[in-house]
Structure formats: structure tokens, C-alpha cells
From Swiss-Prot:
InterPro entries: PLC-like_Pdiesterase_TIM-brl
Organism: Loxosceles arizonica (Arizona brown spider)
Keyword Lipid metabolism recorded: yes
Swiss-Prot/TrEMBL keywords: Cytolysis, Dermonecrotic toxin, Disulfide bond, Hemolysis, Lipid degradation, Lipid metabolism, Lyase, Magnesium, Metal-binding, Secreted, Toxin
Tissues where the protein occurs: Expressed by the venom gland.
Physiological role: Dermonecrotic toxins cleave the phosphodiester linkage between the phosphate and headgroup of certain phospholipids (sphingolipid and lysolipid substrates), forming an alcohol (often choline) and a cyclic phosphate. This toxin acts on sphingomyelin (SM). It may also act on ceramide phosphoethanolamine (CPE), lysophosphatidylcholine (LPC) and lysophosphatidylethanolamine (LPE), but not on lysophosphatidylserine (LPS), and lysophosphatidylglycerol (LPG). It acts by transphosphatidylation, releasing exclusively cyclic phosphate products as second products.
Any Gene Ontology biological process: lipid catabolic process
Subcellular location: Secreted
Listed name of the protein: Dermonecrotic toxin LarSicTox-alphaI-1
Entry GO terms, CC: extracellular region
Length: 161
């Protein structure tokens, strides 16, 4: 049994709880399924400084399968929070010594915020209105550069067009 096509992202809101990752890994190993870690990704969702996130991953022994989330509730996302942290995460993902594999931004419900997130280079968007994202992806500025993820995509590989 290879675990099928199911993937899981352990999304942890507090850096101090990095031991959840090591405990999860140890439990799979002790149950005789260490290979299932190939299906597990990691995310610290507490909006901490990217450098501090990296330190927590090092403590947990994480060397890959890192999704970095950034975001806030949709009602204040763009005009209070901005995309500075997401841009830092994208820069880390794109650097030769970065630890991030994917960057996703949430919660994006407006056309303008969707465009801003895509322009920042995020890999994914969480939304309450998928039609908004689909419509933006069909615009000439985005249709050659981005696409909707498919069943066959590897969630740990950065999509390059």
C-alpha cells in the first residue's frame, strides 16, 4: 500500500509546536510506514518571520515538502496586510538556498487581490470564490503563465512555466 493519491499538509499555527512534525514522523515510522512521509508536507501558518520559520523547520529536521502560507481573513487582506510577507516567501522559494517549495496566499476573494497575488508569484490561492480565480487566470496577462492545478501535479514541486 503506497498511501494512494492522498497528500497531507501539516499546517501548524505556532512555531513552538514544531515537535508535531517530529512526532508525526516517528509515529509513521513506528507503525511501519515511514514511506508515507513522501505524502506529507509542512506549513507554519502563524504569519511569523520567514527566518524564524526556517529555524523551526531545522529543529524539526524538515528538508523539503514545505508549503508556506501567508494571509489573513478576506475582509482585510489587501488593504491592511498587503503582500510583503508573501513576496519574501516567494523570494526564498526562488533562491538557490531557499527552504520553501510552494507559497500560497489566503483568503483571496476579489479580482484585484487575485491579480496582486499572482503578480507576486504565489503558487496557490485559497478563495471562497473559485470563479474569480478562474476568470483572472483566463485573462491575457495570466493565461500563459499560470494554470489550475491538476490531479497529476506533484504538490511538492514548484511549477515552472
Amino acid at each position: 500500500n503506497n498511501g494512494g493519491r492522498a497528500y497531507i499538509v501539516l499546517s501548524i499555527p505556532n512555531l513552538a509546536h514544531y515537535q508535531l512534525i517530529t512526532g508525526f514522523k516517528e509515529t509513521l515510522k513506528n507503525k511501519g510506514h515511514p514511506e508515507l512521509m513522501d505524502k506529507v508536507g509542512h506549513d507554519f501558518s502563524g504569519n511569523d518571520n520567514i527566518d524564524q520559520v526556517e529555524k523551526a523547520y531545522k529543529k524539526a529536521g524538515v528538508t523539503g515538502h514545505v508549503w508556506q502560507s501567508d494571509g489573513i481573513t478576506n475582509c482585510i487582506a489587501s488593504f491592511i496586510r498587503g503582500l510583503d510577507r508573501a513576496k519574501k516567501a516567494v523570494a526564498n522559494r526562488d533562491s538557490s538556498n531557499g527552504f520553501i517549495n510552494k507559497v500560497y496566499y489566503w483568503t483571496v476573494d476579489k479580482y484585484a487581490t487575485t491579480r496582486e497575488a499572482l503578480d507576486a508569484g504565489v503558487d496557490g490561492i485559497m478563495t471562497n470564490y473559485p470563479d474569480v480565480v478562474a476568470n483572472v487566470l483566463s485573462e491575457s496577462a495570466y493565461k500563459a503563465k499560470f494554470r489550475i492545478a491538476t490531479y497529476d501535479d506533484n504538490p511538492w514541486e514548484t511549477f515552472k512555466n
